């Protein structure tokens, strides 16, 4: 009787000791986010998202993101595309604002998921769109647009730009790679023929340089 009780006491003590040792063992971290579905954390701190294809063992890789929220939005778009209204979402309030893939191919789902991941939510949700592109993407797109516009302006300028004529040039004058012809009366081999009407219209300042009356009588 005494031996039986001591055996039970020893077994109970062994069980307690085993339970304590189990508690002390480190719990293996699966990397899954405690809140967001379809989101895991990499050892180097990035967050990844993927989703299983319907009726297949393969998964669609959605990308690696700097924040769990971005990965969660990517998962929501993929879940909506594959499962439809039955999908369990991380952000159900944004379901009407998420981009939709053009088809159910893995590639198109990835593209739509990336668009949703790189958007940030606004404070108020509306039926139109409660998502806007992040500031970094907006700046990049704007710089690209400005750069292309500037390039077009420079090309147009090269087409329509004309050389500056300055004050005056005599004869055939070279300016850079372009030639400008100035029709100067000083280079004429013969004086022009003047009629009486033309003579009356000549300014007085020119009559000092030319004997216009003589030219008229020529």
Swiss-Prot record:
The protein's matches in Gene3D superfamilies, at most eight in alphabetical order, are given as:
AP2/ERF domain
Major subcellular site: nucleus
Family annotation (Pfam families)? AP2
Q: Which GO terms describe its cellular component?
A: nucleus
Q: Residue ranges of region Disordered?
A: 1-37
Localization recorded for this chain is:
Nucleus
Which SUPFAM superfamilies does this one have? Answer: DNA-binding domain (SSF54171)
Bias type Polar residues, positions: 1-10
- Per the entry, what induces it? Slightly induced by cold stress.
Q: Where is the composition biased (Basic and acidic residues)?
A: 17-32
- Motif Nuclear localization signal is found at 40-58
Task: Fetch the CDD domains from UniProt.
Answer: AP2
What keywords sit in the KW lines?
Answer: Activator, DNA-binding, Nucleus, Transcription, Transcription regulation
Q: Which GO terms describe its molecular function?
A: DNA-binding transcription factor activity; transcription cis-regulatory region binding
SMART domains from the UniProt entry: AP2
The ranges the UniProt entry gives for DNA binding are 35-92
Functionally, this protein is described as follows: Putative transcriptional activator.
Q: Which family does it belong to?
A: Belongs to the AP2/ERF transcription factor family. ERF subfamily.
Name the chain's protein: Ethylene-responsive transcription factor TINY
Organism whose genome encodes this protein = Arabidopsis thaliana
| Name of the encoding gene | TINY
